[in-house]
């Protein structure tokens, strides 16, 4: 577990102000940098936390990867969009980040096979395939974009956000479970965390006072619409596979108390192990089934028999020849 060497670094990352225990007075205050320059803090494990002038905080790993929200590896284009001066905590989204026709190609690294992690990865892919318009196929020699599942070197599972082009990794632990594999694959399909939605404060309370300082950047809100991507599915989904549970032994300062709860009635929720109904609707809204126009050429034969005066019975046999590869449009 990562820890900060100085407690006062808590205030350099974010501060939560409370007013008379009234949720309406809860305010998330991101860092203010009047000099318009980047600032850096270091965790005890040596990882660097970079705070940008707009208040966005990301973690830089020793291998150079930039991580946002705890387990989302950003490419250069996404990092630039995230850290634009006018972007409070957003990220660039466009159609190029989605996998064409919902077809995802993949490979499994040797260490994943040796560790047995591939079993849960296969189970995760099957779970998604059975519920969504998405299919997973092993990489072919001419495949241009694909996912390679590799073992994580720091015991944390992570993924890129959406299709990034070429080979992209999903890092899993040797003891990864199916639900974590589903979660990371969903990041690769373009989904973000439900608890980082721009409107999350309308539905839940995030108690930064009970979140370890080094985890604060995992819970900053985004400034883009949530996972539904315009499907009109408004309520925050506490059953989603993309939301953390209300309690966390490693996340919470006091694990006996929740760090997130529902705003309406104060109830909590647990980690979810499967895609929720809204997760499925969201993925199927983004990855709708492809529609093809197929040209068919009829070939018919006509045969008949005469069975008496003025009576004629005929039978028509037709065969349709379709050429989908040449006539998709």
PLM features per residue range, with description:
Residues 14-15, 312:
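Processing junctions and N-termini across compartments
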Residues 17-19:
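C-terminal motif of bacterial Sec signal peptides marking the signal peptidase cleavage site
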Residues 295-310:
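Short, solvent-exposed loop/edge segments of extracellular or virion-exposed proteins
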Residues 317-329:
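Surface-exposed interfaces of beta-sheet-rich extracellular modules
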